[in-house]
């Protein structure tokens, strides 16, 4: 049981780490390249079914795990982040049921993977632009629509918007993994203590 919860926590860490980048980019116009690479790499590993296969090293999820640790300890300062995470988890249910959108996203990810091979960098602006456009043309049509708040100066820049959308796609990818691991919204009420313990284990 512990192993399953440990894996769910890693998937959730992937969700919130990508969304933390969304929040940061929207407010400052800047992202953390290492976190962006971890997020985009998880998207490209579309057929992977375990956290290790999706994210690689657990330490690459340290930021997300720390955010979860703060959330479970009632110490999270950003009150918008949990709302965004809940919206993404709800959106995942709509996404996975729409086979046409799933197919379109899969094809778009394959195109982005070719770009990564050409540029040698999963955080390259061309890759982020492709994935951002993919999100806009597919997932953004689903409901609930994810609303991102931030600095209007940055939210008016095409490159910033593309990177935000690419990070939202990454958050959704982690939400899909979370559901594959039998994650349920009831976890936040009925298994909160167990998830908090799993977060602490992952951070050791």
From Swiss-Prot:
| Pfam family for this entry, one | DUF489
The reply on keyword Plastid is: no
A GO cellular component annotated for this chain's UniProt record is: cytoplasm
Q: Where in the cell is it found?
A: Cytoplasm; Cell inner membrane
Membrane topology field: Peripheral membrane protein
Keyword annotations from UniProtKB, A to Z: Cell inner membrane, Cell membrane, Cytoplasm, Membrane
Q: Which family is this protein grouped under?
A: Belongs to the HflD family.
Q: Which named protein is this?
A: High frequency lysogenization protein HflD homolog
Species name: Xylella fastidiosa (strain 9a5c)
